[in-house]
Each structure stands twice: as C-alpha cells, then as structure tokens.
Amino acid sequence: MHARATNHNWNATATINYYLGTTHLFTLNNVLTDFRRCNASLLTSEVLTDAIDKRTRKNITGLQYRLTPTDKWNFSVFGKYYNLYVAGPVATTEAQDEYVRTSHRMDFWGYGAAATWFIIDGLQTKLSYEKACRLPTIEEMFGDEDLETGDIGIKPERSHNGNINLSYSNRFGQHSIYLEGGLVYRDTKDYIQRNIMSMSGGKYAASYINYGNVRTKGYNFSLRYALGRWLSIGGNFTKMNVCDNMKTSMGSTAANINYKQRISNLPYIFADSDINLYWHNCAKKGNTLSLTYDNQYLHSFTYYTSNIGANKGDYVVPNQFSHNMTLTYSMMRGRYSVSMECRNFTDEKLYDNFSLQKAGRAFYGKVRVHF
C-alpha cells in the first residue's frame, strides 16, 4: 500500500464567567473541533485523490452554576449539550469498488452535580455525579488508514458516572505531603470496544464496535512527598474492574457466558511512581538541572474474556514493570530546555493489550523553546 493521508485539524474554545457577588458564579463554555482527512493513492505517477473525504465536527456546550457560600464548601450543577456530525465514504458493492458519501448527526444531553467540603484544614472531600457522553475519537470513526479500521456509524458512549474522593495536604517546615484516594463507579451504554480481526496474508487489524452495557467499579490512591525545592517523590495505584453487564448475548436471547466478567484487552491493575531531584541555579542563576526516575507497572490481564484467559496462560499478557530516566537542563527560568531520556533502560519485555511485544530500550533527545 502506497498512499498518503492528509489530516486537517482545528479547534476553538470560548468561556464566559459571570459573577453575582462573591457567592454565585455562572460559566458558559463551548468547545468546537473540526477534522477532515483527504486520502490519495501514490501507486501511479499521477497522484489520485479520493473523491470523498472523511470529516467530523464535534461541538460541546456547557452551562454551570457554582455556589460558594464559605471557604469551607461549594456546590455546582451543570448541563451539557453534545453535537456530532460525521461524513465519509461507504461502499455500495461487496467488492468495495464503488462508494457514496454518507453523513449523519447526533445530539445528546448531559448533566451533573459536584460538591467539595473542607472538613478541616488540609482535609477535603469531593463528590460528583454526571450523566455523560463520550464522543468517539478520530481513530474509532475513521481508523488510521493502516491497521486500525474505523466505523463512521459508531455511536457515542453514554454513561452514569459517580466519584468520591478524599484528599489531605499539609506542610511541615520544608516537608510537604499530599494524599488522595477515590472510588469510581460507571454504568456505560454503547461502550466502544476495540477488537482484533484477522486479515488476509496472516495479518491482523483492529476494529471498533458498540457493546451494549459495561459496568466499571474501582478505586485509586496517590501519595506525594516533597522536601524543599530539591526533592519530590510520588506514586499512584489504580484498580479498575470494567465488567460485561449484558445478561444475554448481543443480538440474541441466549445467556451471555461472559456476564460479570472483565472486558478483554484492558489492564485492570496499574501503578506508577517517580523520584525527581532538582539543582536550582545550576551553573547560572535561573537555570535548573533535574534528574527524574519513573516507572510503570501493569498487572497481568487477559486478551480474551477473563473467564477464558484466566485458566490458559497463552491468553494472558504477563506482568510488566518498566523503568525510565530523564535528565533535563532548563535555562532562563524555563524558556529553553534540553532533555535526554532513556525509556525502559532495563530492557524489560513489554506488550500491548493483545500481547504483541513493544520495542525495547530506547533513547530520546528533546529541545524545547517556550515563547
């Protein structure tokens, strides 16, 4: 395949805040994104551009009211309007040699509420609920013109989300700590699932479908400690069970053998930690030398439904624990910086969600200029 895909992206954001005294705040926000992809074949001396391009436009408008009667607590309610426009080619023959342009629009409404309460100084709790909509990504709708096959008819995910968080922060001289823990609940309809399909020539590609109902229950915990301006240590741990909540099989009245089982190809336990060292005014005032070590851990998971893979090691992606190191020198208070990074410096065997091995140890360099 010798082809070229040209993507055009643009987005616009507008936010208006209106304060009514010091207690009431009204916020109106609008986010508009537009994407267009033009494909061309380079197999001949003359570039042949597809007659039908692929296009999507997303518009999300939100209105929020926030009540802040004291410094101890606040309460917010909000509503959202989602609009999605998708257009692209659809084959009209089994040989897929003739296409017509098709398009459709979808509208959804969402709403929610959130509250924050400072129980004592430094101790804060947050509660939130949202009827949400997740619009599909570019890859889920159009693929990547290679090994990802999109579906322009895929529907957005719709879910009921609940979150409870508790956090604590404090400073003791040069020492500061931050702890946070939370519980997560989601009930998702039309869950967008990534599947692997077999292609000719022994090749495989990914496709996306809407799966009826998925339920997520989980928790997360994070901890961070800092000593002055020269040391920072932190870590996160998450367990997220994303389970099949369909009692019957899709498009059938037969019992679903995967009911209450974890969705395939999704890690459900993962963690990371990092250590950062800073040398301020290194060589010159305003310059900083920093050294960062970080790691990522993924617990083993199945790339078929868990009640199948749990008893067959061949269907399990093994535990993964990778280590990275980054050295950065920033100048003129961060205006210029040069970084050198070694990812997976212990050359661990790492895999994607379908047990395909990733590249090993890698080195990167980066120069950044902040205007």
Which residue stretches match the model-derived regions?
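Short loop/turn motifs that connect adjacent beta-strands in outer-membrane beta-barrel proteins
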Residues: 19-25, 68-73, 120-122, 171-178, ...
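Extracellular loop and loop/strand-boundary signature of outer-membrane beta-barrel proteins
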Residues: 1-3, 11, 44-52, 64, ...
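Surface-exposed extracellular loop regions of Gram-negative outer-membrane beta-barrel proteins
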Residues: 1, 25-42, 55-97, 106-112, ...
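Outer-membrane beta-barrel translocator domains and adjoining extracellular loop/strand segments
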Residues: 1-2, 38-46, 87-96, 137-145, ...
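Gram-negative outer-membrane beta-barrel transporters
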Residues: 179, 184-187, 209-304
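Conserved C-terminal beta-signal and adjacent last beta-strands/turns
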Residues: 61, 65-66, 113-116, 127, ...
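Membrane-embedded beta-barrel scaffold of Gram-negative outer-membrane proteins
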Residues: 118, 124-130, 156-217, 238
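Transmembrane beta-strands of outer-membrane beta-barrel pores
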Residues: 32-36, 67, 81-87, 129-135, ...
